[in-house]
């Protein structure tokens, strides 16, 4: 799981500085992201207490996972119509450097 991967320090080896999740409070395309946050955010944050994990809600925004690395490098993964499990896999890919 993403929390387990991050707790092993995988993201730290890549210079991961911050994770941001953008989503809409109401859109059907963000439903899986909302489910992910409700079910897995606490575990993820506990396993990564030193890593900023930011949740940004905005009306009509397309859901995305953003990762900021050392030297200001950023990557993003679109999460539109993803299930909570697909969001978890996307986060695992970011933490392992595959995204």
From Swiss-Prot:
Topological category with respect to the lipid bilayer: Peripheral membrane protein
Keywords: Acetylation, Disulfide bond, Electron transport, Membrane, Mitochondrion, Mitochondrion inner membrane, Respiratory chain, Transport
In-chain residues carrying the UniProt-annotated modification N6-succinyllysine: 64
Main subcellular location: mitochondrion
Compartments reported by the entry: Mitochondrion inner membrane
Cystine bridges: 24-58
Modification N6-acetyllysine, positions: 64
Pfam families associated with the record: L51_S25_CI-B8
Highest taxon of source: Eukaryota
Modified residues (N-acetylalanine): 2
UniProt GO cellular component terms: mitochondrial inner membrane; respiratory chain complex I
Subunit description: Complex I is composed of 45 different subunits.
Functional description taken from the UniProt entry: Accessory subunit of the mitochondrial membrane respiratory chain NADH dehydrogenase (Complex I), that is believed not to be involved in catalysis. Complex I functions in the transfer of electrons from NADH to the respiratory chain. The immediate electron acceptor for the enzyme is believed to be ubiquinone.
Similarity-based family: Belongs to the complex I NDUFA2 subunit family.
Name this polypeptide is given: NADH dehydrogenase [ubiquinone] 1 alpha subcomplex subunit 2
Organism (species): Gorilla gorilla gorilla
Phylogenetic classification of the source organism: Eukaryota, Metazoa, Chordata, Craniata, Vertebrata
Gene from which this protein is expressed: NDUFA2
